[in-house]
Each structure stands twice: as structure tokens, then as C-alpha cells.
A protein has these predicted regions:
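Helix-boundary and membrane-interface capping/anchor signal
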Residues: 22-209
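Short, threonine-centered small-residue motifs that mark membrane-proximal processing/anchoring sites
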Residues: 2-9, 13-23, 193-230
Length: 231
């Protein structure tokens, strides 16, 4: 019985992991004005391995991005953004130079103000993919430059507008990333290098308190598996 119970719990856990494998944020044009969602990022840098650049996790390199929907007008969706460089020891210096994401609906253009006041699109170093839209403090497109939001800087706030190719009732954004510049750790084995985030994770305090119907269905199915195993 214990083996069957363990298998049931493992199946439920596996289903939950698969459901949350990709971080996607969604806003409704009518119901979600004023809604804030926040993602957190880790970090990685390009280590040289056998004469190849390999994306390698770097402990302590981290940041967050919060987006608040403020207005929808035709094809234009406007958000307030807040970027925080939360890097900790052993990282002693880093700057967030770019943030960006992909969209399910095609984006035809974008604009922004504040520190991250330049928009673009294109390849993201170390990720092996291109971003539909990105906003940068310096540099070109989604690569970024040498300036940005440093560890001791105040949270960077501004506004950005996404122009979709067609009017849409739902904004669905995914594949979030940030670029880091001037990354240095305590012993300087990593000194003044650029980096990119790995996985983006939806922060718990932005999750609705009531589970969505799909989540309820998964929970009920899981409880049924466990109950059956116990019998």
C-alpha cells in the first residue's frame, strides 16, 4: 500500500511540475487593468569549456521584474515596470542592462521610458533564442551594454507600451529574461563579465488566492489517486 501511495504522490507532483514548467503571464484587457505580476530571475555567465562558451549558473546573481497593466487602447497595451537588482554574495557587482520577453500575439513595436528607455528585439546571448521585444538601459537590441541598474541602486521604475499587430483581448507574455553587465564575484575568478538569466519564476505573492479551474481539477484528480491508493 505504501508503494502505491508513494507512486500516486509522485504522479501528482510530476503533473504539477509539468504544468508550471514555463512561466507565462496573462492579462485581460477588461478585467486585469491594475493587476501586477512579478517574476524573479537567477543568472548565468558564459564559461569557456573546451574552447566553447557554455552557459554556467552563477550563485548570487539575481533580479526581479514586476509588470502592472495600466491601460489598453486599441492595439496598444501599456504597463508600468519595476526592475530590482537583487544580486547577493558571492556576487559583489552586477548591472541589469536589459529585460525582455516573448508574446503569443505578434508585437509590431514597443516604446518605453525611464532607465530602460530603449526598445528592440533580436538574439539573446547565452539563451540561443531571439526575443520578440526587449527594453534596455544601454547597448544594442537585446544584447545590452555596460551600464544599467546596479546592486545598490533603487528599484528602477518606468512605463512601457506594447503595440500588437492586431487588437487582442488577452496579453500572454512568456520567455522572460534579463541581461547582466559588469558581473564580478568576491574572489574575482569572474571579473567584469556579461551574463543572462536562466529560468524566470512567478513570485508567489502575485498568484491569485483562488486556484484556477485547471488547478482545481488537477488537485481533485491527485486526491482521488491518493485515496484510491490508501484503499
Amino acid at each position: 500500500m505504501l508503494f502505491r501511495l508513494s507512486m500516486a504522490v509522485a504522479l501528482l507532483a510530476g503533473a504539477a511540475t509539468s504544468a508550471n514548467a514555463v512561466t507565462t503571464l496573462m492579462w485581460s484587457s477588461t478585467a486585469d487593468v491594475g493587476k501586477t505580476q512579478t517574476v524573479s530571475f537567477d543568472g548565468q555567465y558564459g564559461a569557456s569549456v573546451n574552447k566553447k562558451t557554455v552557459a554556467t549558473p552563477l550563485a548570487g546573481l539575481s533580479s526581479t521584474l514586476a509588470l502592472t497593466l495600466t491601460k489598453v487602447s486599441g492595439k496598444d497595451w501599456t504597463f508600468d515596470y519595476a526592475v530590482d537588482n537583487t544580486s547577493l554574495a558571492p556576487v559583489v557587482a552586477s548591472k541589469v542592462s536589459v529585460f525582455g520577453f516573448d508574446s503569443r500575439g505578434k508585437i509590431s513595436g514597443g516604446s518605453s521610458n525611464g532607465v530602460f528607455g530603449k526598445s528592440g528585439s533580436g538574439p539573446v546571448p547565452l539563451l540561443g533564442s531571439s526575443a520578440d521585444i526587449c527594453f534596455r538601459a544601454s547597448g544594442s537590441d537585446c544584447t545590452g551594454g555596460n551600464s544599467g541598474l546596479a546592486i545598490d541602486d533603487a528599484v528602477s521604475k518606468g512605463s512601457l507600451t506594447l503595440r500588437f499587430e492586431k487588437a487582442t483581448p488577452l496579453a500572454e507574455l512568456s520567455s522572460f529574461f534579463v541581461r547582466y553587465a559588469a558581473v564580478t564575484n568576491a574572489d574575482k575568478s569572474i571579473n567584469n563579465v556579461n551574463g543572462t538569466s536562466g529560468d524566470a519564476v512567478l513570485m508567489a505573492d502575485t498568484v491569485d488566492s483562488v486556484p484556477e479551474p485547471a488547478s482545481w481539477a488537477m488537485m481533485i484528480t491527485g486526491f482521488g489517486l491518493i485515496g484510491g491508493a490508501m484503499r
